[in-house]
A protein has these predicted regions:
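HAD-like aspartate-dependent phosphatase fold
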Residues: 1-125
Length: 125
C-alpha cells in the first residue's frame, strides 16, 4: 500500500500563475510508485475541473476525484450532515456555487446581499 500525499496547491504546486519547478515531476513519480496524490486548497473561487485542467497542463497526476477545495468540502459536508437543506444563499465565489449545484442544492445568489450585506437583503430570499 502506498502513501497518501495531501498536497496544497497555492504556494506548493504553483505560485500565482507559475508552477513551482520540479513539483509536477516529483508527484508524477510518486503516483507511478503507487502513492495516491490528492490536492487540497482553501480557495473556493474555482471549480474543481478548473484545478484539474491546470494541474494536467503542468504534467501533474490528476483525476476527477483528486482535487478537494473548500467549496467541494463545504458542499459535501452540507449534503451529508444536513440533508434537509435544499436552498442555499451563496455570498461567495463561482466555485462554491457550482459545487453546491453539483450536490443538488438550489443555489440563490444576490448581488445586493453580497454588496450591502444587510439583514434586509438576506431576508428577501
Amino acid at each position: 500500500m502506498g502513501l497518501l500525499l495531501l498536497v496544497d496547491l497555492d504556494g506548493v504546486v504553483y505560485r500565482g500563475a507559475d508552477p513551482v519547478p520540479g513539483v509536477a515531476a516529483v508527484l508524477a513519480d510518486r503516483a507511478s510508485r503507487g502513492d495516491d496524490v490528492v490536492y487540497v486548497t482553501n480557495n473556493s473561487m474555482h471549480y474543481r475541473a478548473d484545478y484539474q485542467t491546470r494541474l494536467a497542463a503542468m504534467g501533474a497526476p490528476v483525476s476527477p476525484d483528486t482535487v478537494v477545495s473548500s467549496a467541494r468540502a463545504t458542499a459535501a459536508y452540507l449534503r451529508e450532515h444536513d440533508p434537509a437543506i435544499q436552498r442555499v444563499l451563496v455570498l461567495g465565489a463561482g466555485g462554491l456555487e457550482r459545487e453546491l449545484r453539483d450536490e443538488g442544492f438550489d443555489v440563490v445568489t444576490a448581488a445586493a446581499a453580497a454588496t450591502r450585506m444587510s439583514q434586509e437583503a438576506i431576508d428577501g430570499y
